[in-house]
Amino acid sequence: MKNINPSQTAAWQALQHHFDAMKEVQISELFAQDSDRFAHFSATFDDLMLVDYSKNRITTETMEKLHALARETDLSAAIQSMFAGEKINRTEDRAVLHVALRNRSNTPILVDGKDVMPEVNAVLAKMKDFSERVIGGEWKGYTGKTITDVVNIGIGGSDLGPFMVTEALKPYKNHLNMHFVSNVDGTHIAETLKPLNPETTLFLVASKTFTTQETMTNAHSARDWFLNTAKDEKHVAKHFAALSTNAKAVGEFGIDTNNMFEFWDWVGGRYSLWSAIGLSIILSLGFENFEKLLSGAHAMDKHFASTPAEKNLPVLLALIGIWYNNFFGAETEAILPYDQYMHRFAAYFQQGNMESNGKSADRNGNPVDYQTGPIIWGEPGTNGQHAFYQLIHQGTKLIPCDFIAPAVSHNPLSDHHSKLLSNFFAQTEALAFGKSRDVVEAEFAAAGKSAKDVEHVAPFKVFEGNRPTNSILLREITPYSLGALIALYEHKIFTQGAILNIFTFDQWGVELGKQLANRILPELENDSTIDSHDSSTNGLINRFKAWRN
């Protein structure tokens, strides 16, 4: 990957001049000028996903200039480098190959000259065998009972992805009850364990190093809870499995290393649901559905790797995001799924995007002089409409939004889905086109009120519109289509990081807080007054000590 400051390119300067011409342009004008705008600014993937980006503040010229930026920063070479297994995560000297985990074509992918696919396939086969024994009832707990509940203990990428997918694909789940524990707050593990039976509960401890503070604290509490009933440590092996690479620590914990599922340093945590970290997904949905999830992602991988940029969906969405973030000053993007099963999707890509591209040093180690990753947030529709859409519609912030919905519901109750989708369509229309003062007054006039009668309230009913949105309409949310959708967003994030000249696949920003927490923890063991920090931190620690007793 080349290290090119995007803001110093000719394409960036051209975009800056173009922005001056575009900043006052109305989306409504763009539609008025082009009756086929939808056709010109939308694309379908695999006849399963429609991406409509026509309700954006863009023209053909805008996209041409954004594509010029991608060319000048050598995006195509960056894509090739990732798929070729080059060590593009340079700060950790690692390849970035989550695409290998779902490489259903099984073509060789090399890291340091070694094909990784045999190992990938071996772990998949091991997970298939293990999951089939648990799901089928062959795997027994220490009293001979079959497993009814599975608790995944992890944090960050070892939790967010599997939790999101098992929720999104709940219509496909089997009889096993799936639980996820992440927070080191004892309340999380305590509340999760309350209704469970130690005789029928299986724990998955997801930590590559088997040293992650939050995960191992929860794992030891789960082990203590289990042994409080089981008594004998030899029974731990029947109720715990590990998603890890630290065989020594796994064995010392009491887990049979035959039930340790490995992954590799070229798998980043927030891109790891496709790996052994996805074992909870397999146990919830079955291996066949996990394979379909992989296949959908692989199909998007092929699209991303081989489709020209002008028709490449992750590239298009990435470029539009850069346009708003760097030229319009938009600081956030909202992800708004109109599907209740997808209620964790925004949280998943909050980590996916913000941990990946929340960087302020470029690939040369210099401070950036442009915007990098946006703030990502969102909630399912229609709930959000009754919470924060007010600000999106009439506030002073520009918030580009992704609206996501399936055409087919898994729960076709009465007219629920039609009402849901009518809101989905209405919101993007309202955000784009708004409602003028003239229309407001005309509506009042139709109700028999004069302009003078309503002049005190009319300004508050005006919607400026010109709020940009992307609409992603899926035929149905299935393991395959969800896999493709997740990969779409993953590659969007990669594209933005490549163009913005930052390292997308490290996360050094999480380290300082952990270091300081490890330093502070021993200071909390007694009641002595602390004075080794700044006055604020000292004051907080000392008040905590005074109040905890």
Swiss-Prot record:
One Gene Ontology term, aspect cellular component: cytosol
Cellular location(s): Cytoplasm
GO biological process terms on file: gluconeogenesis; glucose 6-phosphate metabolic process; glycolytic process
UniProt-listed PROSITE patterns: P_GLUCOSE_ISOMERASE_1, P_GLUCOSE_ISOMERASE_2, P_GLUCOSE_ISOMERASE_3
Active site (catalytic residues): E355 (proton donor), H386, K514
Keyword terms of this UniProt record: Cytoplasm, Gluconeogenesis, Glycolysis, Isomerase
Record's keyword annotation contains Isomerase: yes
Alphabetical list of Gene3D superfamilies matching this protein: 1.10.1390.10, Glucose-6-phosphate isomerase like protein, domain 1
Reaction catalysis annotation: alpha-D-glucose 6-phosphate = beta-D-fructose 6-phosphate
This protein's pathway: Carbohydrate biosynthesis; gluconeogenesis; Carbohydrate degradation; glycolysis; D-glyceraldehyde 3-phosphate and glycerone phosphate from D-glucose: step 2/4
EC number, as in UniProt: 5.3.1.9
InterPro entries registered for this protein in UniProt: G6P_Isomerase, G6P_Isomerase_C, Phosphoglucose_isomerase_CS, SIS_dom_sf, SIS_PGI_1, SIS_PGI_2
Molecular-function GO terms, alphabetical: carbohydrate derivative binding; glucose-6-phosphate isomerase activity; monosaccharide binding
Keyword Acyltransferase: no
NCBIfam families: PRK00179.1
Homology family: Belongs to the GPI family.
PANTHER family: GLUCOSE-6-PHOSPHATE ISOMERASE
Protein task: Catalyzes the reversible isomerization of glucose-6-phosphate to fructose-6-phosphate.
HAMAP family noted in UniProt: G6P_isomerase (MF_00473)
Protein name from the UniProt record: Glucose-6-phosphate isomerase
High-level lineage: Bacteria, Pseudomonadati, Pseudomonadota, Gammaproteobacteria, Enterobacterales
Gene transcribed to yield this protein: pgi
